Design a protein with these regions (language model features):
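A gly/proline- and charged-residue-enriched helix-loop-helix capping module
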Residues: 86-110
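N-terminal secretory/targeting leader peptides
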Residues: 1-88, 108-109, 113-296
């Protein structure tokens, strides 16, 4: 009997993550019957619901920005530390085997999930409808959408913003309603969610190098035969490499596409970046005071 695998995501057809999931499906569809809902927000469901739906087996496989998992695994806040990593390679290098093992074990032992891999969720930058965000003074009073993550909320508040934490579903609605002055996201989301229609000032802040968790329901995975598990595991490894390469290619192309949408792009100077880093330092220290085993 052919096993059915139910897959879901939260982004549109052209996004890196949806293209990546389609690659995963291509690799496994000779062995499984697949159903794939590309974007659950089109059905008025919040992106964050993917976690619970995958935990309870309503769906089998999904992906989601690591920030949405921090209430389950506080160690994941390491990947969200603002202005902490030198660059994307530094972030990937510090996502080492020790940290991966901690996350894998907690997902498996406490949350009914098996980690299939980490995806590149893109370098996060800040956009605004009012001005470039070159210094903390530029943040003052602006309503910014953040993810529903306490570290993000506290960080942007400390910069001077008025944080408005929103799931992807509500973020899209807030953009349409004109409820936001600013937002922070990787370029793929800035483009796919058409942020450029209302926010014409994009500042390359590179404040967070984001990751997605690629997951499968534990019960589903453990119900598979040895051969089926190997297919899922090997296909996941291939998919993870495919995703990182695709994400890098897209990031290089997106700036050109965004500029064509009449968006002005500026890059924060190293001197001004230090001002944000100085404010962020207290969040780094607070995290490592609780998780000093991750200070590497």
């Amino acid at each position: 009997m052919i096993k059915n695998i139910k897959i879901a995501g939260y982004q549109g057809k052209e996004s890196v993550h949806t293209q990546t999931m389609n690659e995963f499906i291509r690799l496994i569809n000779h062995k499984f019957s697949i159903s794939f809902v590309e974007d659950i927000t089109n059905y008025n469901q919040k992106a964050s619901e993917l976690i619970k739906q995958t935990q309870n087996g309503e769906i089998d496989v999904s992906y989601l920005f690591s920030s949405y998992f921090t209430h389950l695994i506080p160690e994941l806040m390491y990947l969200d530390l603002p202005f902490y990593f030198r660059n994307k390679n530094d972030a990937f290098n510090k996502l080492n085997e020790k940290l991966k093992k901690i996350i894998y074990n907690q997902l498996k032992n406490s949350h009914n999930l098996i980690l299939l891999g980490f995806w590149d969720n893109g370098t996060r930058h800040i956009s605004s409808s009012k001005k470039f965000i070159n210094t903390p003074d530029d943040c003052t009073g602006q309503i910014i959408r953040t993810t529903p993550n306490q570290l993000h909320i506290d960080t942007f508040k400390s910069f001077g913003f008025k944080p408005k934490p929103l799931d992807v579903l509500d973020f899209k609605k807030a953009l349409l309603n004109g409820d936001l002055d600013a937002q922070e996201n990787p370029l793929t989301n800035f483009y796919q969610f058409k942020v450029y229609e209302t926010q014409k000032y994009l500042t390359k802040t590179s404040h967070v190098y984001g990751f997605c968790l690629f997951i499968i329901n534990k019960k589903c995975f453990e119900s598979l035969s040895h051969d089926e598990k190997e297919i899922i595991t090997n296909s996941s490894n291939i998919t993870n490499s495919f995703q990182r390469n695709l994400a890098t290619e897209e990031e290089n192309l997106l700036f050109k596409q965004i500029i064509k949408k009449n968006v002005q792009v500026s890059e924060i100077t190293l001197k001004n970046k230090e001002k944000f880093k100085k404010i962020s330092k207290k969040f780094h220290n607070s995290f490592f005071s609780k998780h000093n085993n991750l200070n590497f």
